[in-house]
Amino acid sequence: MSKVTVIDHPLIQHKLTLIRDKNTGSKDFRALVREISMLMGYEVTRDLSLEEIEIETPVCTTKAKTLTGRKLGIVPILRAGLGMVDGILELIPAAKVGHVGLYRDPETLEPVEYYVKLPTDVHERELIVLDPMLATGGSANAAIQFIKDRGATNIKLVCLVSCPQGIAAVQEAHPDVDIYVAAIDETLDDHAYIVPGLGDAGDRLFGTK
C-alpha cells in the first residue's frame, strides 16, 4: 500500500486557508498555489539520494554532499496542475517537465487522454505528478496509468487538497505511488466537488467559469 503524507507545516496551512477563501482573486490564488507547491516540495524531495564528494572551499579541501541517483521530472495534469509547476521548479530547476491532458467522456464518464508529452528518458526519472485536487481519483489514476504505459516506474502524486475517496481510489489502483497532500477534507458532494474544498482549482487559477 502506498504511503500518504499530509504536509501540515504552519505556513502551508495558512496559505491553504487563503486559497480556500472564495474572495481570494485569481492573481493571489496563483501566487499562493505556487508558494504552497514550493513548500510541499521540500517534503516530497526529502528522500532524494546524496553522495559525498570532495570540493575546494576558499579555505580548504573538504567533503560535501551532492544529489545523485535518479533524475527528476514534473508532470502536471492539465490544466490546473500547471499552477503548481513553477513552485516545484524553484526547488529543482533542472527537472524536465512533461504534460498530461485529460477530458471526461460525457457518455462513459471515463477520463480520455487528449495530450501526453513526456521526457524521452521517462523510465530513468523519478516523476512528480501534480494536480491541485484529488477528488474521485479518476483523473489522477488515468494520468498515472498513461505515464506508466510509457515506461515510468517511479512516481509520486502531489495534491493540495484531497478527500478519503480519492486517496483510497489511487491507493487501490496504484499501490506503488506515494501521495503527498496539504489537507484531507471531509468528503465529496453530489457533483464530485471536495467539501469544504476550494472550488474548481482550474477556474480559480485562470479566471474562467
From Swiss-Prot:
This is Uracil phosphoribosyltransferase. Gene3D superfamilies: 3.40.50.2020. GO terms for biological process: UMP salvage; uracil salvage. It catalyses: UMP + diphosphate = 5-phospho-alpha-D-ribose 1-diphosphate + uracil. Its EC number is 2.4.2.9. NCBIfam families: PRK00129.1, upp. Pathway: Pyrimidine metabolism; UMP biosynthesis via salvage pathway; UMP from uracil: step 1/1. GO terms for molecular function: GTP binding; magnesium ion binding; uracil phosphoribosyltransferase activity. The gene is upp.
